[in-house]
């Protein structure tokens, strides 16, 4: 090619040329420069270099190098070289876009840096990992990189090696790797740096994968020490011709001396958890390697026990954790014993303290990151445990194995020998059985047999069974198969059919159903099994079913593995791949599969997790479903629970988490074998369908629920993020107390227990983060639940007054009239608007009813009319309620939708405890007295939350951020679209129980319809739809459920596109029997989810399989919870700070009397503090800003081309705009945040206006009158509250009736009657008081102007308007009555009417001094609160004449005059000094007659109980002589009498 303008491309000459390069050389014809390539470079005799140039016409010519010129590439000119610099860069991914700029990452000031060719592909945490390795290498010490699998430990090591070996990833590396003689011929000096060598030890399965990765990411000189060529490679290493040597554990053991003779810069060990046994040969070899810098790579540094952690760390950093004995005493024993479910506070506190000490000691030497770092790049994963019942044949075989003599020998091996030697049987006279097998050998053999039977009985007929097991199996089969001759005959005649027949295995029946479903759905399935013999059975089943499959196990060659994986991922015909659980390593990247089925568990949880990660990894595009099949009641269940035990221990030690404490067992402890360890737990068959896992999870769930409820109501630390707007109510059905279960919670999700019915399932509302309902103490496992009536204020028209913010309403039982009125007013609007705006299905959240067996305090404050009673008998309790929003990190357990049991006739209507309202975060102190000096206390999130205002419903809800601790990582800022949001909902905890067939057939004649309301949640800017269904990734349509309840069971019937109301409901409701189908909001770009695919969810599929006994989500079983954090914090505080309660169970929440007054002071917050989120700091007061945010306006403004949405900015956008504002005002983010918190509302609005108007000037118009409008709204609100207070006061003055007083007295005495009967000896007591105030105000003046309303007028208003009122429930411990008084007296806007008390121990429950509810401003004697209201005696002293009663002339000056409207009390009678009155007072007959004739305001059905209550409560009471300085003990005795 002729070059007409050579100067344009040949501007410079190169000093060095390489063969293969293109150049500009003089043409053979006209001497003009033309393009050619250098074939070779030679030197003449004078030392002058020449190049043999090859022209395009294949002619060659020798030309001096100085005449050659470099070709400069242009846009319209091809490349000058065969491979230019970019082509020679490593790594080079032509199909991938370069993610970042080409810049090196500096590791030190000396110049060591990660080359830009590698750095541009690294993530931040990977750079941090490389820097961690480099720092320890420079300091000459070892370390452990413990990242999860899939985070790129290999690339972090390669980055570190590239920096240390000064690699550039370009042509320069190629030249530096050339032999020295070539470098000399090119007049290039060899690298002056000292030659370094690194040894990498890895398992054989990943050895060549390391080689491929090193070749991909850089120009490294690598040798592999393995196989027949290892001697030659050792010679090269001795000549230091290599930089990196790869070898296996076995080769290292064989060549230890030769390798120790070399000087290694560092040794890097992959899968370092293999160095876990101090006595193992591999550990001894690894510790014998002569190298100071030992780097270990492992994702599971602790797999079984803490001894393994010590062994690995002691290899990497000898002496870091001390000796093995020291480590066991200082760390291992405290941590493991503190992890027990029944641990004491001292054990838990000591364990947590040891955990923190261990984490601090390892922090500089151990680096671990989890997959949460990349969860934004991973799809959703749903992990389900499916418990399969054994078939009758399997049970017979399993039971026969357990009844053998050998198993009996195993079970009695630890008992004292019968010879009287004092030794155990296995060490004395019963060392072996009759055939000479030791107990240990028998134990392992029979465990294997039990595992085979639990999976498939056909495994017992396997031809490859060992001789020893063959003998054992033959004896077992002879006994069992005599009862099943059909199996033996089929095994002989048609072994293939027998092995593939699912009827001999419960798991196979379940697997058959699953595979049929996944084949229809075109899903790709990975089927894992630990046993290759079981894989043979599964393979034969696939062949018999005509399924196209592939198989990969340990016998598969490496080259075949790649082919199988590639074919499975790409082919649409191959939907099943059978994989051995232990076949890990090279090429197993099954991202084409979206379903993983683990047919059998292993003892090591890492094996199962690694199997799951074969499909759940970066590159996976679909949601992954994980199903683990467990044989119910067998040894497999123990295996799975031991996995949970080990994973929880790993969370504590490695993750430094307060892991949930499920088990009472401690591994290796003879005293605490618990439910996991010991041969008695292994060789056992739990019959009758009982599930140990369910029992354990329920037990822990109840503790979690109780602690979180106590925390929420006692300590003021909310268990969920509240919604700002209410949602639709639900119709509820009572459930038997004994069926109230609680299960473990979700990450941002909440679990449930649910009975599995035939082909129908409830859509579980509690599994949606937006719809959990708050717990009652009864549901939390507490035996004392107080019934309460909640009332809301009404305006002048009788309509409910909405609260300012959200009202976190709980389901409550309304009277028939109230329900009818509410439905008439709101049903149309709710049904038409909510279903169109919402995408969340809401089903009944809570069902509550009393059980006679429960020692529940029964107090019904309001009387029920006959119509109400009739309504309850016919249609049940229609409880209308709304659940709180649950944050993703919350672990509160909400038991919902439990199997309904027979309801007692004398059932009690319970009200669920309320949550906290958005605008109310003042906290009320609450305590529980257990009668044994143990106290349960904390701060309650008060004031009492407001009830849902049905007319004020909206379909939007915004989560309120509680604090910085709740801010999640960056993936939370990504807007989740409907499909991903649906995935998130399904990753929740669920419990499903197998029901008996006879229960399924029973249907009630009066069904109760549950309205399921959808709701679009705008939390964190997430507008995505949330669908409640059990386990399907299908998202085409929403479903509605028609619920029918019976006495023994309830079932859901799917109704398409409509909801029909029960015929039992009042007539006006029937006009809305049909609802229009719901449509997604316009901003959603997703189609409607089809009903058909909803029905095809996993639970629907498994519903018809009889062998499925129990299903629960494994999503959040592992790890910590907020409740566990609370218990750990309380235990540490009590043991190490307060030095008390150290021997109490850690699950008991105890409030210290030393700090309770401090808590009370912290709980009494100012109105400005109420609007601020509570802090997570235990007993510290909440953080607040001086000028709280009061702007809650949400509006939409539209201009010509722009739409402005105010008040609904997503969280991720808010963070981004906040950073932009900080840069706009030229301040660091932290300083800008502090400035914002100090600024007033007007200043903040001005800042916002200035910022937004910079880009959009029209925004200024939106900020003009916002401040003034806000002030007006606040004043208007305060005025409304003042007017209502005056209205109530005037009403009180006009109607001071004796009936109201009597009502209070009757109710109080009835309560006292029940108290004295059940808990007078120190049980916890809770008094109920009703306050009429519904709204919190922005100013203290409005609160001061609120006038108190007595408890009795509340009862009248309840009967009058049937409107729910707020209820405040107080737990008062006997040891802190003064603190309670301070709280009751200082709480603004709240007056407490404590008229009834019950003695506890030797101290009074309430002792109110200087406080009178009727006249708070007056001073009273301490005895005023002792006798309470004696208005029942009014008739005794009533004047018989028309004129008023004449008072005596001489009146004592001591007591203060009573209020105008106050009835006579005991002290008024004494002050009158009327002998006639005093004689009547001491006349027993007169008192008895008076009590008999006392009018009752309660229903007639309670009259007998009321009279008995009055007489018993006042016996020997009125004339008891007490001095003014009476001690507490005498007061308590008086109250009990």
UniProtKB/Swiss-Prot annotation:
Record note on modification: Phosphorylated by NEK6.
EC numbers: 3.6.4.-
Disulfide pairings: none
GO cellular component, one term: centrosome
Domain Helicase ATP-binding: from-to ranges: 134-319
Superkingdom assignment: Eukaryota
Motif Atypical PIP-box, residue range(s) on this chain: 772-783
Compositional bias segments (type: Basic and acidic residues): 755-764, 834-857, 1276-1292
Short sequence motif named DEAH box, residue ranges: 270-273
Main localization category: nucleus
Membership in a protein family: Belongs to the SNF2/RAD54 helicase family.
UniProt cross-references to CDD domains, sorted A to Z: DEXHc_ERCC6L2, SF2_C_SNF
Subunit (UniProt): Interacts with NEK6. Interacts (via an atypical PIP-box) with PCNA; this interaction facilitates cenrtomeric localization of ERCC6L2. Interacts with CYREN; this interaction is DNA independent. Interacts with XRCC6 and XRCC5.
Domain Helicase C-terminal: 510-660
Alphabetical UniProt keywords: ATP-binding, Centromere, Chromosome, Cytoplasm, Cytoskeleton, DNA damage, DNA repair, DNA-binding, Helicase, Hydrolase, Mitochondrion, Nucleotide-binding, Nucleus, Phosphoprotein
Organism: Mus musculus
Function: Promotes double-strand break (DSB) end-joining and facilitates programmed recombination by controlling how DNA ends are joined in a spatially oriented manner during repair. Also plays a role in DNA repair by restricting DNA end resection in double strand break (DSB) repair. Facilitates replication of complex DNA regions and regulates the maintenance of chromatin structure.
Enzyme class, first EC level, given as a word: hydrolase
Name of the featured protein: DNA excision repair protein ERCC-6-like 2
